[in-house]
Amino acid sequence: MTDTSDSQDAVTVERTFDAPVDLIWQMWTEPQHFAAWYGPDGATIPVAKMDVRVGGTRLISMRVQTPNGAMQMWFVGEYREVVDNKRLVYTESMSDEKGNMLSPADMGMPPGHPATTEVRVELEDVGGRTKMVMTHVGIPADSSGGAGWAMAFDKLAARVSAHTNT
């Protein structure tokens, strides 16, 4: 089940996965897993550097195809809260490949897109399955953020299914 709701300043997606909490946690916190599902359809993640601890940094590169060819975007952030198998909170800002923050306007984002957003992931064991609630705070309601996350979580569900059926 997917419930995507947009408000003025947050996108929230709730999903239940047929997998244990520790596997979903690994998908969020281990670079090789994260890179396999993150981003909308067609996106690849050539770089996922993740120091998953409070105060640790993350540097993610997303490559997408556009009508004008391939485009590579970089995101930098910091982990604010890490509670194993329960809660993950990190910031996210557009950056260059060295992790220097860039203006959203310089990256072609619409007016009002914040320089720094916050991603909150809550995981709950529901009889061996995992209920996940992800809130991306700071994403404007009229952005494509909700659709992008929904596509990413479809990819996550496929990866989890493949992982649990091996």
Per-segment meaning from a language model:
Residues 1-45:
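Hydrophobic ligand-binding cavity/cleft-lining segments
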Residues 1-8, 158-166:
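Basic/polar N-terminal segments that are highly enriched at the extreme N-terminus
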Residues 5-7, 52, 69-73, 111-115, ...:
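A generic structural micro-feature
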Residues 8-14, 21, 57, 74, ...:
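Intrinsic-disorder/low-complexity, polar/charged segments enriched in Ser/Thr/Lys/Arg/Asp/Glu/Gln
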Residues 24, 34, 58, 79, ...:
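Hydrophobic pocket/interface hotspot
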Residues 81, 86-150:
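Beta-strand/loop substructures that line and gate deep hydrophobic ligand-binding cavities in soluble
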